[in-house]
Amino acid sequence: MVLADGQMIWGRGFGATGAKVGEVCFHTAMTGYEEIMTDPSFASQIINFTFPHIGNVGANREDVEAKTLHALGCIVREDVTAPSNFRSLWRFDSWLKDHDRIGLAGVDTRALTGLLRKKGAQNAVIAHDPKGQFDIPALIETARSWAGLQGMDLARSVSTHQSYNWQEGIWSLQNGYSVVDNQKGPHVVAIDYGLKHNILRNLVEAGARVTVVKATASFDEVMAHKPDGVFLSNGPGDPAATAEYAVPVIRQLLDIKMPIFGICLGHQLLALAVGATTYKMHQGHRGANHPVKRLDDSKVEITSMNHGFAVATDSLPEQARPTHLSLFDGSLAGLELTDRPAFSVQYHPEASPGPQDSYYLFTKFIDLIAKERP
């Protein structure tokens, strides 16, 4: 792998061959690499896993957050070995190869993490050639010429193109994923800016009937489904770029006092819709053990996070009340509107991977819908 500043990081390639350019970042979760690699929020990113053993349980069809892998590749400390898990269907390296994703093993991932922590997320090219033949100057130039995530709208590239209904509930060891019929439940329309499947599962488990629409759906297209509430999903890229088509729709929904719940990118878009601003973080928050303080009662939730942009707390208008703060750096982790039935969080209450401290937010959304639209 080569960084835009010319630094080279050598390792043992696995997965697909070729080269891919994107932003390299680090993720501190000890488990859940399947969920992480398939999370659409990681589009155009290369993941440096801080935990040394990645791939040891292989890959399967159940522990994924999308139909394909969205991260461009990954960097790991130890070589990928044969999986040891009764649910495994593929070796991790074979899984990456089948989805045209590149891996790099044998890297001092702690040193790379230290570099990224100091210098911030970096543009990089990850390359794999079994013969070890690389045009280093060309790779460096590719990394330097890549525009970067700032100003980039990636939501429409990972979003669904057609609306669909979702009935799958959360997974259990005995029964796998359940199918839940919530025809009498409140109808939630989820706008897909890069939806994770486990968000949809938690909405269903909370009692919602769920319909998913594309990121670029207009206000009329959303309302054609007669929603009782609208969910704004997570997703990749710069929220300010996605806002060009998303914010006008959200503002129209706010005007009719539609109950709204946003997660991650959805949180940022809700903030932009009420006049706040967002910024690119130095290194971002990516892990499954991030403590968040709930301001209403000072309780702490351990959360899963994955974002490289954030909402500027001091830009919030009077009607947007901060509800959660990151205990790592004090950045905004949640907000609630005082004049509209809308709230959002920067972190991932659906986890996958991560703790389940914040599952209650899905129930809160359904309760809000019941209150506003009895």
From Swiss-Prot:
Keywords attached to this entry: Amino-acid biosynthesis, Arginine biosynthesis, ATP-binding, Glutamine amidotransferase, Ligase, Nucleotide-binding, Pyrimidine biosynthesis
Active site: 264 (nucleophile), 348, 350
Source superkingdom: Bacteria
Claim: Nucleotide-binding is one of the keywords in the record: yes
InterPro entries found in the cross-reference section: Anth_synth/Amidotransfase, CarbamoylP_synth_ssu, CarbamoylP_synth_ssu_N, CarbP_synth_ssu_N_sf, Class_I_gatase-like, CPSase_GATase1, GATASE
Enzyme type, top EC level: ligase
Recorded family membership: Belongs to the CarA family.
Protein name per the record: Carbamoyl phosphate synthase small chain
